[in-house]
Amino acid sequence: MVHLTDAEKAAVSCLWGKVNSDEVGGEALGRLLVVYPWTQRYFDSFGDLSSASAIMGNAKVKAHGKKVITAFNDGLNHLDSLKGTFASLSELHCDKLHVDPENFRLLGNMIVIVLGHHLGKDFTPAAQAAFQKVVAGVATALAHKYH
């Protein structure tokens, strides 16, 4: 559960409506793979991840980023029940994919960075604080099934 004030909820909703989620997802995942190269080990099947330009132009990175942002959007629609919303994804990433749960926090930070880039001056410090709460809540929900 994420506790947002009414003003924070309004800011998140308003700004999210301005976002091209296809672009944000691919860019956020791409940045994660560039900035934290050890995360590439989870994406062996994605082909060329040899450089920043290869990663940022990789169609599989962009496609998976779109899936990530689609799930994130689902979380935005269920802020009061994030653990339930992300239960199956948490289980998948824990039991089958064996993803280090710290990576969820890192990806959340990449999402916030990309939002700042795309939204410019509209992404005020208060809006950033609200989105940081959201990505922290999503990261916690995704890590919920870890033992």
Swiss-Prot record:
The keyword Ion transport does not apply. The modification Phosphoserine is found at residues 21, 45, 51. Gene3D superfamilies: Globins (1.10.490.10). It holds the Pfam family Globin. Heme b binds at residues 64, 93. CDD domains: Hb-beta-like. Coiled coil: none annotated. GO terms for molecular function: heme binding; metal ion binding; oxygen binding; oxygen carrier activity. The modification N-acetylvaline is found at residue 2. Residues 3-147 form the Globin domain. The keyword Transport applies. One of its GO terms (biological process) is nitric oxide transport. The modification Asymmetric dimethylarginine is found at residue 105. Red blood cells. The modification N6-succinyllysine is found at residues 18, 60. Belongs to the globin family. Involved in oxygen transport from the lung to the various peripheral tissues. PANTHER family: HEMOGLOBIN FAMILY MEMBER, HEMOGLOBIN SUBUNIT BETA. Heterotetramer of two alpha chains and two beta chains. The D-major sequence is shown. See also the entry for the beta D and P-minor chain. This is Hemoglobin subunit beta-1. The lineage of its organism: Eukaryota, Metazoa, Chordata, Craniata, Vertebrata. The gene is Hbb-b1.
